Every structure is written in structure tokens, then in C-alpha cells.
Amino acid sequence: YTVPKEQFEQNNKLMASSGVGYISYFHTFNSDGSLHPNSTRMIGGTGQPYVTGAWKGDYWLFEVPVKNFKSGTKVRFTGLTRISGTGQKYWSLQYMDGTSWKPATDTQTATVNGEQITYTHLVPTANMQIDVTMTFARGISDGSVKIRFYCEANTTGGTEPNGGTIRWASSADNGYNDSPVIQVVE
């Protein structure tokens, strides 16, 4: 067992507090895979994962190992998320269905810095509840359910990542273990 700080900050694989699965975050600013100095993965004092330096193309990955996962299975994703004042605002919740990423809920469009984008969530600086149920058209015989939260735009207008943050929050009432949650509902 490794502590959450080491799991996420060093290994990029924060294990679920209950059940199986993990959270990772992928920074994509540098094409060689190296991190920009403003891009970090952190565990806050409450145990909540957050990152600095989010950039268009970055994503949170939520992965749950499965066997004999049948087509037509419904999976519910719930979570609280928020950004700092200089965090990236436009994100898409997507799920891997076969070999394609699909939007987990209705999409919207916006023009950001002259570019038209498609997104599912406009993330505020106060906690936003996400509660989405998606139906997987394709089964998974032996693999993982994959859901990602993908950064769709550079809303800061800068040329490189800044220190703005995005986090998965939770509540003290539940020991900070209630967000995000992924569960099969049908």
C-alpha cells in the first residue's frame, strides 16, 4: 500500500478509497511527455486530488478494471469538481465505448479565443456537481471501463500553462471519500 500522495503525485495512479479503480491525470502540453514547470499533480490537505497547469488536450482518466462487462450496461458517474480563478473552464466528460470516446452527456458549443469548441461542462470556481449515467453499447470481456474529463480549450489566452488548478472535491461529512463515484446501475 502506498499513500495517496505518492500514488497520485509520483505514480499518477490514485487508487479508489473503496472498490477497485483509480484516477490519473495526463498533462499534454509538452509533446515529449515531460511536464511543464507549472504542471503538477497534487494531493491537498483534505486528500483531494488536484492539478496545476491544465491545458487543452489534458485529461483526468478514471479507470475501473472489469471482466464480462455486458453491452447495454449503464454506469453512473458522480463527482464534485471546481477550478481556481485562473483554471481552464471548458471540459468534456467522455467514456470509451469500444475504441471511441463518446460524450457522456449533451454537448454545447462556445467560441474561445476565436476557436469554436464543443464541451459538456463549464466548470466554475465553486463546487459543481456532475451526475451522469451513460450506457455502454459495447461490452468489455477483460479490460477497463474508462471515463475521462477532457480539457477542451485554453481559456486563459496564455501561450503556456499557468498555476491555475482543477480538483475533484468531496465533503467532510463523508470523510472526503465521496467524489468521484463510479457505479454500475443496471
Placement of each model-derived feature along the sequence:
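Boundary/junction segments of secreted and surface-exposed precursor proteins
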Residues: 1-2
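Surface-exposed, low-complexity/disordered Ser/Thr/Gly/Pro/Asn-rich loops and linkers
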Residues: 13-71, 176
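Aromatic, loop-rich ligand-recognition surfaces of beta-strand-rich domains
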Residues: 54-63, 78-80, 173-186
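Extended extracellular/luminal ectodomain segments enriched in beta-structured repeat modules
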Residues: 57, 66-78, 83, 88, ...
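Hydrophobic residues positioned within well-ordered beta-strands of beta-sheet architectures
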Residues: 60-62, 75-77, 91, 130-132, ...
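Short beta-strand segments and strand-loop junctions that repeat across beta-rich extracellular domains
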Residues: 79, 92-100
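Surface-exposed loop/edge segments in extracytoplasmic proteins
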Residues: 99-107
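Terminal, low-complexity interaction segments
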Residues: 101, 113-186
